[in-house]
Regions:
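Short amphipathic alpha-helix segments
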Residues: 30-41
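Auxiliary tRNA-acceptor-end handling modules of aminoacyl-tRNA synthetases
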Residues: 1-25, 37, 46-232
Length: 233
C-alpha cells in the first residue's frame, strides 16, 4: 500500500493518476483544496463530499445562515482554489497518537472526524495541514497543491460539482453527463441516513460497535427491495 514504510530493499512501482490508487490520491488532495478554499471564503460554512457523479463528485455546501449558493459564490471559491494551487501550498502530514488526533479535531468542533478517528481501531493517526486548515484523510495526499493542474468546480442543483481528471487521460477533465435519476437515488440514500441518524462513516462505525449491524443491513435491504419493485413497475 501507499502507507507502507520501507526498511529494506524492495521493488517500488511508480503510479500516476491513471492508476486507481494514484487517482484517489489526486482526488483526496483536490477535495482538501476545495475544503480549505470554502473555509477561507465562507468562514463557518460546512462542506460535505457526498458521492461520485458523472465527471466528478457532488458536494453539499452550506453557508453560515443557510443562504442560497450563487454562481458568484462558486466563482469566489474557484479563485481561492486557484490561488492555493498557484502558491504550491504544501500538504503537511503529522503522525500522532489517536488520542492526540482526537483532541486536535475536538478543539476545532469536528465531531464527525472525531467519531471516525475514535472508531478506526488505530493506535496512531495521520492528519494533514494545508496552511492553517486541518483535515483527516484515509490515505496519502500529493506533496503540494501545485500538483493539481486539472480540475473544475461548478454549481449543480443546490450544491457543488467538483470536476476531476479523466481516468484514461488525466490531462483533461472527465466528461460530465447529466444523470438526474442517479442523483435522486443518492439523495434518497442521504435522506434515509438522516432518518437513521447516520450522517457520516463515524456514525455507521459506532452503530456497528453497539451491535446494530444487522438492523442496518435489514433496513438497507428493505430500501433496495422497494427500489427494485419501483423499477419493475
Amino acid at each position: 500500500g501507499l502507507k507502507f514504510r520501507l526498511y529494506q530493499n524492495r521493488d517500488v512501482e511508480f503510479i500516476d493518476a491513471r492508476d486507481g490508487s494514484g487517482r484517489r490520491v489526486y482526488v483526496r488532495s483536490l477535495c482538501f483544496v476545495l475544503y480549505k478554499a470554502s473555509c477561507d471564503v465562507f468562514p463557518g460554512s460546512k462542506l460535505f463530499i457526498e458521492h461520485p457523479l458523472s465527471g466528478g463528485y457532488y458536494c453539499n455546501f452550506k453557508k453560515r445562515g443557510n443562504e442560497p449558493l450563487t454562481d458568484d459564490d462558486v466563482n469566489h471559491i474557484c479563485q481561492r482554489m486557484q490561488e492555493i494551487i498557484d502558491q504550491d501550498m504544501p500538504f503537511r502530514r503529522t503522525e500522532a497518537t489517536t488520542e492526540e488526533a482526537v483532541r486536535v479535531f475536538s478543539e476545532r468542533g469536528f465531531s464527525d472526524k472525531v467519531k471516525l478517528i475514535e472508531t478506526s481501531g488505530q493506535i496512531y493517526t495521520d492528519y494533514y495541514m494545508l496552511g492553517d486548515t486541518v483535515d483527516y484523510n484515509y490515505g496519502p495526499l500529493v506533496p503540494s497543491a501545485g500538483y493539481l493542474k486539472v480540475w473544475g468546480l461548478e454549481r449543480l442543483y443546490d450544491g457543488l460539482m467538483l470536476r476531476v481528471p479523466d481516468k484514461n487521460n488525466p490531462l483533461k477533465l472527465s466528461e460530465r453527463v447529466d444523470m438526474p435519476r442517479t442523483f435522486e437515488m443518492f439523495a434518497e440514500k442521504v435522506r434515509w441516513d438522516i432518518i437513521m441518524r447516520l450522517s457520516n462513516a463515524g456514525d455507521v462505525n459506532k452503530a456497528i460497535l453497539r451491535g446494530h449491524a444487522s438492523e442496518l443491513i435489514q433496513v438497507s435491504e428493505a430500501l433496495q427491495e422497494k427500489k427494485i419493485v419501483k423499477i419493475a413497475e
